Amino acid sequence: MLTILGYWGLFAAGMTVTADDRRIKLSDFIVGIGAFEAIVGILQAIPATAKIVPNYFKEIFSGFSSGGMTYTKEYIATGFLCTPFALAAVLTVISAFALNGMLYDDKKARKIFYAISLALMTAADILACVVPAILGLGAVYVISLIIAAVKSGFAKDKKPFIACLVAFIVAGGIFTGLFASNEFRLMDEKIIFHDSFDRLSITGTGRGDDTEQWIYPYLWDDGMYTAEQNLIWGTGPDNWGTIFESGAIIDRSYNEYIDLLQSRGLIIFALTIVFLIMTIVKMCKLVAGFMKDKNGWTGCAVSAAVLCYLIQAFFNISSVTSSPYFWIAAGLVWSFTAVKS
């Protein structure tokens, strides 16, 4: 409950930032955080530096042997956010700020800072080795590219579109380079069970059967079953006991919407969906206003940030180290219709 109240507090704080110059300053600070987390993540993924940077995922649990538990050496980016999934969510939000600021801000120094930060975050996101990182990052680039293409038709200025296209190509180059060097691999299932069994010590070591079904639908089925058994009020925030009794293998579904339904129930789920729809409507108006130069690039940035977070949330979970960024961005969306200072 305190966590939820804290999130709404961050949302309210975002709503109070009604001056565009202050939104830009806040964006500078947020992008700086993203660049820092990206640098830490990259260092965690480099064998020579990984041993000196704290990381819960330096070694991944792989099973049991006669000598006890066995682990494999891995080099996975988490930043200082505890898990690769949290890093994926945070960098999705912040990359949207960095890319839009790089495209549309008037100051050259800020453009350069955002461009460097974006490159770092792109590399770190890929090195997180999980689906939501690739999905969220890809959404940021694709959505921003579409907006830039439409904007260029309104403003007759092709520079932002060309810059976004170049950024998209550079991101593709970074991905190709990491893939070619065998530094890119998706390790979602191993990371999920290592996080649950080894880091948090709350559930088992893996699936309870031999199915080859992709891990996400497998977990979603468990989550929906639990939600159906506790449809109105949910299980509450600590749903481990309910999950254990129902025979599920883990206490999280790795789908933020299913997690919300199973833990908070149908009423809170419906209210949250209404809130998200209202926010998306405001986002559409912000982007439309940006096309006609009625508001600055921060409106476009926060809209892209919220939308891309919602996309990657289908394969991610809420976390105290990542969700605050979403709520701040959502508050900034609503700030455009608040009383302007």
What are these regions (language model features)?
Residues 1-13, 21-180, 263-301, 306-313, ...:
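Alpha-helical transmembrane segments of multi-pass inner-membrane proteins
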Residues 26, 182-195:
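Extracytoplasmic/periplasmic ligand-binding sensor domains
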Residues 29, 132, 216-217, 254-255:
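Conserved glycosyltransferase catalytic-site signature
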Residues 57-74, 92, 194-214, 338:
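Luminal/periplasmic active-site loops of membrane-embedded glycosylation enzymes
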Residues 186-190, 198-250, 257, 264-271:
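TM-adjacent membrane-interface loops and short helices in multi-pass inner/ER membrane proteins
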Residues 319-324:
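Membrane-water interface of transmembrane alpha-helices in multipass transporters/channels
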